[in-house]
Amino acid sequence: WMGIAMALMAYSKYHGALVVLFIVLSNLRLLKNPKFYVACLLTLALIAPHLWWQYQHDWISFRYHLDGRTRDFEYSFVTEYLLNLFAIFNPFLFPVFLKGWWKTKGHTPVLRALNCISAGFILFFLASTTRGYVQPQWEIPATFGVIAVLYLFTQGRERLRRYIVRVGWITIALIALVRIEMIFNPLGLKFEVFDNRASYNEIAAAADGRPVIFDGSYTDAAKYGFYTGRTAYAQPSIRYRTSQYELKDDDDRMAGKPAILQVWDLSLIHISEPTRH
């Protein structure tokens, strides 16, 4: 089962390798266990199709993650990372976690692994800020260790336990309110995430059934397809990363057919007249 779990983590997110690494570091005796190597071989067999695909496409996503995201260092990478860290793990609970992690000892292999995963992810991505911006969601695997530490640290500390329970209920209520706003937008906020459906439906109406070619933005093409169910394509750009649209045959299928070219210019949307592509 360990081999299957490691393979599923690899398919889900490459950061799954960090989970395995930190588990091994928390219990080096695994390196003396033959079953661990059998699990690794099973993992390798299960991800072999993905590795073969990577080989056929010049290791495209590996190269992107190892080098394509590298940018000149900015202090804002560190400050934003720390702010996001507090926001993700709750600014009212994260200080408690830090104190609990320092005082709580892992008395079992599982607890040691959870402690190592939580600290390892936080420190690893803190170091990664020297190479570029770190996405907040990359820290999610550390959540399991944070929860375990908070639970253990509150044992025998009734006052602290009541504090965490209260903060937890308040947090759940706030998350529910944010979710309601994101789904229904009763406040009429103009943030991009709240206005996607209307703006992309506007483009779809102008396209009138024709495919839409987005100028260099694979995210806009993907969101257009999601919100409208219509055909979209992202024109490759030498100034931006490689996307899945460069691996598909959309340009061949759309050749010679009428299409709409969409270009973002600040807050304005310019839609060209139908042309032959």
Task: List each language-model region with its residue ranges.
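Hydrophobic, aromatic-rich transmembrane alpha-helices
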Residues: 87-108
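Membrane-interface alpha helices of multi-pass inner-membrane proteins
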Residues: 1-13, 22-25, 43-45, 125
